[in-house]
Structures are given as C-alpha cells and as structure tokens.
Amino acid sequence: MAFAPKVIVVPIDLSEHSRKALASAADLGVCFHSRLVVLTVIEDRFPYPDLFSFDHPTEDFYKVMRERAHEELKKLIEHLPHIKAQADLYITRGRPAEKIVEVAAKEKADLIVMGTHGTSGLSHALLGSVCDKVIRQAPCPVLVVRHSAHE
C-alpha cells in the first residue's frame, strides 16, 4: 500500500522555517490531492514573563493575537494559490506541541509537516523541544523540513 496522505497538518508560527514547511506541505498536497490544515498555536503562557508589563494576558490580548495570526495566515495562503481551495486555517491557544498533536488526532491527519525551528531566540532549545514532543506523541508520521543546508 502506497503512502498518500489525504490530510496534512502544518503548524505555522510565521517563522521562515515554518513558511518553508508550508511550501513543502503545499507541494505534497498538490501531488496527493490532500487537504491542508494550517495551524497556528497562540501560547497561553509566556516563557519570559518578566519581559511583559502584565502578569496574565487578557482576553483582549488573545483576541488581537488571533486576528493578527488569521491575517498573516491568509497572506501566506494567498502566496500559494495552488493550495488556497484545499487549505483550512486553524488558530488555537495553548501549548504548541500538545495542540499540534490534538489537532492532528481530531482532523485524522495522515501527516504532520513542520519546520525545524521557530520564532524564539532560543529556537533550537524551544521549538526543537516542540518538534521532538510532536514526533514522539503524534498519531501519524511527522515530516520535519529544514530551512537550509546551513543548519
């Protein structure tokens, strides 16, 4: 039996690494006529709370973050017109690894395609651990896309 993913989950944090993963997932989606679930997770906790002027983000803060994420995802999809009709945008809040695995299970994903690093300054330590957790807990295969040969 050949591997032909019908549902591909693509976690996006708007970093160059995740944009590269989206482009790769889009190409796979075209080849296999897959539906893409483009997912952004808004963290509900901050790794460095001392950098913020508030202890706990408000619902208004999350609303603004959600709206911005939605606009950015729409722009990304518009730059990949061959997948526009086959992509569902999914924005959720929580811990990234947990939410990626949860959405993959809920959507009955056949594949998760994600980048190697994220937007954090400690990209390898933080998203590397997200990627590692997803690989260990995912209900389906995970394809990790490197940004360049210089990583």
Each PLM stretch: what is its role?
Residues 1-3, 17, 31, 77-112, ...:
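Structural beta-alpha unit
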Residues 2-55:
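Small/aliphatic-rich secondary-structure junction motif
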Residues 102-151:
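Gly/Ser-rich helix-loop-strand patches that form or flank binding pockets
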Residues 68, 91-95, 117:
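Short beta->alpha linker loops
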Residues 39, 88-92, 143:
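General small-molecule cofactor/ligand-binding pocket signal
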Residues 41-71, 151:
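Acidic, proline/glycine-rich short linear motifs
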Residues 18, 22, 62-70, 127:
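Amphipathic, non-transmembrane alpha-helical scaffold segments
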